[in-house]
Amino acid sequence: MSDRPGSASEGEGDEIRPYGEDRDSSEESEDDDPEEAKRIAEGFIVDEDEEDGEGEDDEEDEETRRRRRKEEKRRRKKERRMRREREEAELSEDELELIEENRGLREGRPLKRLRRRSGSEGSENDRAVPTLQDMFRDDEDRMEDDDDDLMDFIEEDEEDEANQGETEEQRRERKRAEKLKRREQARSRPELTGVDRSSWDEIFAVFGDGQDYDWALEGEDGMDLDEEEEAAKKDLRLEDVFDPAEIKARRLQDEDKAVANADRPERHQIVNSTLSDNPVFATDTLYPPPDFAAKWVAPKVSFRTQYLFYNQHPEGSYPIPTIDNPQPYPVYRRPDLEIEFEKAVSTALNMMFVQHLEVPYLWHYKRDVFSLLENQGQSSVLFLERDELWQVYVLGQRYRAIHERNEQTRQQWGKIKARKGDIEDEYFTKGLLGKACVASIEAAGEGDEWLAYHYASDIKAIKEEEAFDEVSKKLPERAEREDIRRGRIMKLVEAFGIDANKVASSFQDVHGQPAPVMNPDKMPLELADEFTGAAYSSPEQALSAASFVLVQELSKDPAIRQQARDFMDTCGLVTVNATDRGMSVIDQYHLYYNFKFLTNKPVLDFRDSPQFVHMLKAEEEGLINIAFDIREDMLASFTDALIRCCRSNDYGEIASAWNEVRMEVCNTLVKKHLMPMASKWIKEHLRTQAEEYIAERCREELELRVNVRPYASSGMEQGETPSVLAITNGKGDIRDAVMAVMLDDEGNVRTQTKFDNLRDEEDKTMFIELLEKRKPKVVVIGGFSAQTARLKDAALVAIRQHAIELLGQNPPVSDAYPDHEGFQYAMAEYDEKLKAHLIPLIFVNDATARLYMSSEEAEKEHPNLPLNGRYALGLARYAQNPLNAYCKLGKHIASVTFMEHHQKLIPQEKLLYHLERGLVNSVCFMGIEINSCVADPYQRAMLPYIAGLGPRKADAVIYGIQKHGALINRMAFTDLGLFGPTIFENTAGFLTIESDLKDMMLEAENPQEQPDPLDMTRIHPENYEFAQKMCQDALDLDVEDVADRHKSEVVQTLMLDDKRGKKLGELNLDDFAFNLQRQGEGNKRHTLGEIVSELIRYRSDRRPAFYVPTDWEIVTMVTGETERTVGRGLKVTATVRKAISARVFCQLESGLDAVLERDYVADEDQAPVTSCDEVFKPRQAIKGVVIMPEPARFQVRISTRPSDLRQGVDFVQPFKDEEYNSKDRRDAAEAATAAKKQRRAGKVQRIVNHPNWHVLNSGQAEQFLASQHRGDCVIRPSSKGPDRIAVTWKVDEDVYQHIDVQEIDKPNEYSLGRILMVSGQYRYSDLDDLIINHVKATARKFDEIQMHEKYKPEHELDAFLKNYVQAHPGRSIYGFSVDSDRPGYLKLCFLSKPTKDGGVIQTWPVRVLPGAYKLGNAIVPGVTELSNAFKMQYSEKLAEQGHQGKTPGIYLGKTPMHLGGRTPALGSRTPAMGSRTPALGSRTPALGSRTPALGSRTPAQGGPRY
């Protein structure tokens, strides 16, 4: 391509495949010689005999093993020579490049597929994963001779005879010479490895030829390792050679291999997204009985199922009105089908967790299982929709977690029973584990806590007997309160007559009768007086202690706690209280304003809303506090229900007195324990609920974007891929050229051209020539500024001129027509003719192109393309296949914005999990042609989203198909060992195999070696018999007619029949389905309908047409403006570009054009404006209001009339007004603000004569500094009094430090003090002195630390430490970052071992002073000294802890004093130091207490418990 701007490539040019690769080599081998390709592929398979033989050698003597090794070696040599001519020396490109990078011989490499290779050990599935042994074995293969098999055998025989008389020394010398010869041969044949001769010379020059260490390769008996290699070589792992991060990124860890080899869907083996950088691998545990799980799952599936089958929610509340359907047709409830619905849920759980079938497979091929035929097949009820199946899967996972937690508790109970013999606890086994603890994961955990509370001593003894090495978790109430429950006071507790277990059981049963409560014979205080003494000095204390024990027992009960959570979920109210800072920061233009005065909003109203995550974010920023409450009457009702289960029904003074005490217990229980616990739970519950809602809405938006066909113009057939020309001018700067990239219909880059300006005649002519030569079906355009509109206009002019040339007829001229109407009619006719020759010009969504252009992948694929060229390539790819473009993003898809204000508030892992689900739905809906997918690296990105697969399994499939060649039919998936039975069932229907239908020669024999027409369809192999039977019926053939023929021959005949639609339409599918159901085949109505659709139009694209963005979407994409920012009635600021008499041409800050007409400059009652250029000058800023937005033209029309400006609005809230925002609270706050302003207006405003002085509060100062640099500051009034000022300076992005400055020696109240004191130790003479020597000096220390190699941004520091320690085992690492929580401080974080091995990232604060750093008590001038001070203090801590007998670990280190012991809390001293050692068997005394006597107990208060 010429370097001259505007020049296009001449000729056809080189074919550049997507991803920078040519056509896959599997196509070439298939074309050359299929038999030879098959023979070569067989050479990759390791014989199982080798593996079996190695296991038997252990039982044989040395001589036998040696003989067997020689035989095995000879056999392997023969096999290697047979396949050497076609293999690439066994080292894949990725492995060679990885070696070269580690040697420093290559700077980078394009990202290419990983080639998995077979191992020498393990199962057959294991061989699909590369091992290190394969890599080194390849080197040995490459060094073998190149002679044929017969010569090799001759040489071996001659060698045995010729070498019989040589000595051992001679034999070793001969071996060395042979090895040297082989190395020289390797150097003379560099093409075998793809490394040129000069590169090999460099390698040998740097690393030598290996002879220096030949002595190390000889065994003790002088034998070379060539003969002893299997016996003497140590098994190496990839981790021993390559960087762990590289292995992890390429998914080559042992866990990844296990996932790839297991016959279970990859997404079932990983808890989070399979695309995550930190996958959480799931354990393969036995799933609980699906029937039991269904009873828990079914009522929670969806609003629809609750409404239809459980009679929940108000009548008519479903279907929910939408924008597309504001008045949906009502549906009838079907509570009579509740049992059938639970059976359908049970079946779904069984298929998902027992049979390991993924949701897309169930939805596409088992949908009939989740529906019920009625009216003799004329109608059906669908129990579970697609998204509901996904929800069943999620709920099934939650139930599994609950079940496993309860099983752990049940096992603990079994240990207690084994210890105590005949102990029984029916309430625990039936009431809790059988019912209450199954309600939620929280209740399951509380069941374990309940057991630990009531059987604390038994569990403690069990743990000590089992001699646990790790520090036990804290057992609730195992010190003082456990002692209380073992004391005499329990007699008083029993006198209350309250059995906590019976109370909990009665409390769950609303209509049940509470167990009777017996009263003592004495009054409460009278009876409590009997328990006074050393422990309790008064009856009130004794009664209080007994009440406390009773409250504890009731508050620990999982059933009661679950009731409290359900009550809060149903009746809870949420109120927002703004903090002092929030009152000033959250104004009417703030995103949080819509909930600033939120008051008593019901918890139920937060469902299906993202609002709560915004509230949590505001609370995190310190702007609001969220409070949960319950109406007094509702809370009283809940408390009364609890009191009813505790009170006595007797009458009399004693009964009333005891009932009063019991009532007090219940009130304390509810207010002090249950409601705070429920409030804490509901907060996290609402967070999770809101995050799930946002993630699901993002998934739905993604599916709307990708579930579309490729762009198709009017003349294209459905399913045809367009050739695309993409153009862009980037940011539209004068330096940005117009880049054009042309993709043909196969996705190959055909042209990459640069133009200066399409308005120039020369460039326009060359652009037209490009259109004529390449003939694109569509031109797509994109950019990053409003200048893209001008490029669009220029391109439209060129495209129209090109169409005129094709038409060969010039447009009509107005002068040739007598009137304007005639001219208009002629132009309309001409435009209609021209339309057929016009190439469409469209905008497309550029989210994927923006990410691709700046990715490392794009740079490696197309290093010669500039950024704008890569952006254009991304646009073209999106137009050809939006789904493929999004799939190619991988984990970076989470960076695409789907919900503008909400998406950033949820965890990336959760978002990625849901987005992956959306891609899985979309890819499975369309399906993939497997052979073309494997051959094209760009299409391979879609393969992981097929049901059953994932990135790891997809890599294995790609490697397997490349190894064996293109697949002929679906049976090859299992015949070649690519899929196990489960994965095949999940996957087969979505992977089609294209063949030439007309050229198929089907024979009844050997169907596995022939193509099958049904493999071209999305019909699942398990339904082939139905398809064949339907084709037979459609062709009106009898069984005898097809008996001796290929089963699918009738399918081929029908698919080639042009009238197949009519013939298949004559089949009565309803009767057929009903008869199948009566015969026990189950409901097959949907399956039969799908089979008919596929047979008529196999693999037809049933997705909607390509979505072209609306005008407003284009404006938002290019400029960032929306209807909310430049819509009608909004105030804007514009800059005058040009003024003429009738109008003014302006530009908004975003680049949009603004036009001001003369009539809209002034009101009618003002002096008229005769000429705009007299009033407005270029570069003048004016205030206006939008009166007519014109997004299609990238412009708005504005008015500057005062009357219009008064009616205009400054800002439109992105969220609707909140009905629960209290107007009274808002009015009171506004009145208080107004009063405050009035008071300030009455006061003399303090003014300091300095350019940095501003009358701002702290929040306003931060906003003022937001766009400025580090070290910039604002000096402002202080709220602490007239003798102080405040300095706010920018430490880092979103980090600001507020410095309190005391003024000393003030002449008067309003003058600045002659001495400015900071922190009581830094004195400055004036404000400039303060800024330069305090603020700027401190900022320089922050700049200095950021230049250090150990500095990382705060959000990256933890990952940096973890990755370093993982990559360098046995080494520690530390790093610095700004502490955003403590402005003016740094965080010094360090890690000594990987977190998976128990390592904990520890943090020390470093205060930044003017010109110094302070760590602990050490003040140092520089970063080097700071590092040394850290190392010294760290060493001192280690030494100190070593003397104290503690495990080294700063602050968070744990001291295993004895079994079950715990480390003191942060900052506490080790109790043993400085105090007397307790007697054997007693406890360590608390800090400050005296040593107990022999055998006595340790005082509990004051010190850490062990």
UniProtKB/Swiss-Prot annotation:
One of its GO terms (molecular function) is histone binding. Coiled coil: none annotated. Keywords: Chromosome, Nucleus, SH2 domain, Transcription. GO terms for cellular component: transcription elongation factor complex. Residues 66-81 have a biased composition (Basic residues). Pfam families: CTD, HHH_7, HHH_9, HTH_44, SH2_2, SPT6_acidic, Spt6_S1, Tex_central_region. SUPFAM superfamilies: Ribonuclease H-like, RuvA domain 2-like, SH2 domain, Tex N-terminal region-like. It comes from the Eukaryota. Residues 1129-1201 form the S1 motif domain. Residues 1239-1349 form the SH2 domain. It is found in: Nucleus; Chromosome. The keyword Nucleus applies. Residues 14-23, 100-110, 168-190 have a biased composition (Basic and acidic residues). Residues 1-194, 1460-1506 are annotated as: Disordered. Residues 24-35, 45-62, 90-99, 141-167 have a biased composition (Acidic residues). One of its GO terms (biological process) is transcription elongation-coupled chromatin remodeling. Belongs to the SPT6 family. Histone H3-H4 chaperone that plays a role in maintenance of chromatin structure during RNA polymerase II transcription elongation thereby repressing transcription initiation from cryptic promoters. Mediates the reassembly of nucleosomes onto the promoters of at least a selected set of genes during repression; the nucleosome reassembly is essential for transcriptional repression. Essential for viability. This is Transcription elongation factor SPT6. It comes from Cryptococcus neoformans var. neoformans serotype D (strain JEC21 / ATCC MYA-565). The lineage of its organism: Eukaryota, Fungi, Dikarya, Basidiomycota, Agaricomycotina.
